Each structure stands twice: as structure tokens, then as C-alpha cells.
Amino acid sequence: MIFLLKILFSVIDNQNKKKIIFFIKKKLKSDPIVIIDVGAHAGETIQLFFKNFLIKKIISYEASKDNFKKLKNYINKNHKLKDIVEINNIGIGKESSTIKFNQMSESSSSTFCDINFESRYFKRKKKILNFFLKGDFINKSELISIRSLKNELEKYQLKKIDILKIDTEGFELNVLEGLGDKIKDVKLIYFEHHFDNMIMKNYTYTMIHSYLSKFNFKKVFKIKMPLRKTFEYIYQNKNFD
């Protein structure tokens, strides 16, 4: 049944992804491009960008050990990706530490954040997922090492990053803060933000907007994800207008 759930959300999100790719193509007119993929899950974003852009390098990070196995298997089965994609089984955050990670039964929802089990959004989502999934909403919790993106990227010596994509289920601001002054080398930041109160984040969307504005980024794209209180955003570095 979990396969049916994935197919359902893939179909629902497909039109959104087409609009996002169309928009990014208008902004990035030079190939090949460099992408940092934080929260790679099973390789969905890698597949999306590989199909639509000429890629120079994709550096991906996935904190979940279970999800990373799927990601590694996907890369190993696609030989064209091996030379341009580097995958890392580590969490990305504000600073180096070890924190609790919640592995969800619906794996794409796995998060470093605590879950508000009393929220109306959680109760509604759980009813839907119970139709497809068996067992607890949180499959397991484990300690995961995280590093700052600034420290991670030092070893690559990248002069520019065309796209920084962040999908970390409530940990997006932590990732951005850990980028430090390397943020000036990023052209586009593509991320999602949950407006529901199921994920217990330590920030709001306004805080993300203020943080990015401070570093000369402007919001250039926004789209609602169907059936969810979640929006996807793209911010552009004004220095790359």
C-alpha cells in the first residue's frame, strides 16, 4: 500500500514540479550547473534535475540511514549519475552535533523535529496514512551526526552554487544558518516550508524570509503543495540578477 501512496503523491505533485523546473530554467541560462541537495531522500530531486538540466555536479545529503540505503541503491542502478553525483549519509544543520532523528513510516516525512501528536493536522494526516500504512507513525528514533553546510562545502572549493535545495521537514532555517558566508556563492535557494503545527519547528517562515533578505536574497517564486499546508519557495541572490 505504501507504493500506492507514493504513486498518488507523485501524480499530485507532478504539475508543481513542471512549473518549478520551467521557472528555474528561465533563471539559470548557463549549463552545466552545480546543485547542493540537502534532504535527498531516495533521489527524487536528483532524478528531476538530471532529466531537465545539464549537470556538472550534485552533492547530496541524507540524514536517515534507511533513506540513504534507498538513495545509494538508486545511484548504483543509474550509471550515468555515478560520475556527477556524490551522496553523503550525514545530517546538515547549524553546527556540528549529534541529535535525535525521527524515522517515519512514511519515509519522506522523517525529521529532526519533534511531532505535535495533539495537532489537528497530525490527527487528520494519521487517518489518511493509516489507510496505507501499518504500525506507528514514528518507526524509530536514533541519534544522527550533523555538520554545518559551510564546513562540508569547504572540501569541494566551489566558486558558485547554482541551486541549493533544502527539504528537511522543519530544519530548513538550521541548514541555512549553518551555511554562513558561503551563502553569497549561491544563486537560487529552493526550499519548502510547513505552515501546519504538526512539526514542532523553532522558527517561522517570516524568520527564514528575514534571514535570506539580510543576505541580499529576494523571493521570486511561491507555490502551494496540493493537499498540504506547505508551500515551496525559490529565493534568488540579487547579486546574480
Predicted regions and their residues:
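Phosphate/nucleotide-binding beta-alpha loop and adjacent structural elements of enzyme active sites
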Residues: 1-241
